[in-house]
Amino acid sequence: MYGHHPDYGYGNYGHPPPFAGPESSNSHYGMPPSQGTNSQNNMMMRSQATEPQPIGNTVSPLEFRIHDMNRRLYIFSSTGVSENDQQQWWDAFSHEFFDDDCKLWFVIGSEPVAFASRERYIINRQFIPKFFRSIFDSGMRELQYVLRGPSRECTLANGSQAYENENVLQITRYDQSSQFEVNTEGKLYVEFAPFDEVMNYRIKAWTLELKRSNEFVYNQNTADYRVEAQNPEQENKPRMGFFKSTFNLMTMLKILDPMQSIMSSAKSAPAITPREVMKRTLFQHHQVRQQNMRQQQLNQQMMIPAPEPEKPKPARKRQRKPAANPRGSKKATAAAAAAAAAATNGVPPTVPTASPANNQQFPPNPMTSQFQQMSYPDVMVVGEPSMMGSEFGENDERTISRVENSQYDPNAMQMQSLGQGPNSSMNINGRNMMNQHHPGMQPPPGQQHMPPHSMGSQMPTSMHNPMHMPPGSMQGHGGMPPMPSTMANQMPPPNLPPHTMSNQMPNSRMPPMQGQMPPSGMPGQMSNPNMMGSGMPPMSMSSQMPGSMSNPMPNQMPGGMQMNQMPPPNYSQYTGGPPPQWPPPNSAMITG
């Protein structure tokens, strides 16, 4: 019914048993005797030496320790120990299996009873020998604990080993008018002290919950145990496997357990008053409790691996970042600030260093005709900080200064807004200059933008765009005769070399008219050779000419006319129409 009778053998541990194993019986939880055998054959089998059989699978050291305790209890019941030696024997038994600070807890009560309402008994280490002796003195002749079902083992934080089994059977036998056996089911939780090479594992805490009990009586006719009918007239009847005398001792120990320290202190110093004894006892109890807490913390620290030491952080070296413009970091900073201010106001940057045309990784972004370039009366300049590498929130000594723009002209701003200034017409038509070419020539491959220092950027808009003039003649200013539109349309295309300008001029010649100069407000006439375009550096035309044409030559002819005012050779062939003016009003001839 309850499985095989435990066979306590040392088959898996290499040591033969020092005593004979428990005699097999016809108990209800043991194997029934085989049919066809008689008592003589059983006696012959008992006399034969048999090897100890292992207990199923490999037994854990904690579980084997409980089996070893059962074996010692069987030795006491099977061997005759004299009355005088029993106290010493139980002291040795308690010292071998129980730690010096061990305590036994017994929780007795049936399952319907609430756990808080069940009987609780506590037995201190000092009374453990007396407890086991009272069990056998009350009439019990055998006591053992059978571990059934799976068990759990774990290591606690303080280094102790815990063992738990929820299906434990406590078997006790006693003899009165007949042989009786009491099987009590319960739950066992045992905490073992750390392993010791001399004492092995010893029990530090023992908690046994006894739930229900069944009593069986041995039948001599059938040689088997049967369930005994309840006999209320029986005086000394066990309850939960213990007799009444054992329960009386457990009740007395429950009362004496809190008083043990006080009683021991009173015996050691009889002259001290009970009040002083209680103070000393409380102080000692507090010291022991603090020591246990420190020991637990130390064990936890030993179990937790020590963290790796942190490497010291390397000393931070403050290094000044290299300037984006090695030639002048202040100029680069000012250019970046001007570009940021222009972008904030909705105007594209006009500084060459901030232009996308100078940066190959940005795609070209031509300016539309709706935008008007604007000038600013002052420029915000962000100075270089005196200490680089400072963290956020620390001292950042960036200084912001205001520099006056010397080239700012309010009148030019107003003229640009009305479309009358020289820069407005050039910038508006600058978009066509980049996208159109001469009808008789192929556009240069892959060339969308001309560099700032090229000749095309230095020439007026009238030379770059031969189609920008409206049909018909252009009205002159200040008494100057009108100029036909064919003259402006025959100017050289933007990509032709400078020396081809004379081939595109009109064929008719006309002597220059003295004393007539184009007004400063005429479109296409340069009032300042250095103001070719916003943001373009001033360049001389001689620097853009080929080497054969840039040689120094005399700047004045014998007649008193400047060389740059002389008409081309075929200018005298002009026929028809009013006499033209030389130089033409819309020409790109740079005057001295």
UniProtKB/Swiss-Prot annotation:
GO terms for molecular function: DNA-binding transcription factor activity; DNA-binding transcription factor binding; LIM domain binding; transcription coregulator activity. Residues 322-344 have a biased composition (Low complexity). One of its GO terms (biological process) is locomotion. Residues 577-586 have a biased composition (Pro residues). InterPro entries: LID, LIM-bd/SEUSS. Gene3D superfamilies: Cysteine Rich Protein. Residues 14-41, 305-368, 437-458, 559-592 are annotated as: Disordered. Disruption phenotype: RNAi-mediated knockdown causes mechanosensory defects and uncoordination in L1 and L2 larval stage animals; phenotypes become weaker in later stages and eventually disappear in young adults. RNAi-mediated knockdown causes defects in vulval morphology and gonad arms. RNAi-mediated knockdown reduces the level of bed-3 and col-124 mRNAs and increases the level of lin-29 mRNA. Residues 378-417 form the LIM interaction domain (LID) domain. Residues 23-41, 352-368 have a biased composition (Polar residues). GO terms for cellular component: nucleus; transcription regulator complex. Expressed in all neurons and some other tissues of the adult, including vulval muscle, and, in males, all the neurons of the tail region. Expressed in vulval cells. Belongs to the LDB family. Binds to the LIM domain of LIM domain-containing transcription factors. Required for the blmp-1-mediated transcriptional activation or repression of several hypodermal genes, such as bed-3. Regulates sam-10 nuclear localization in PLM neurons. Has a role in synaptic differentiation of PLM mechanosensory neurons. Involved in gonadogenesis. Interacts with blmp-1. This is LIM domain-binding protein 1. The gene is ldb-1.
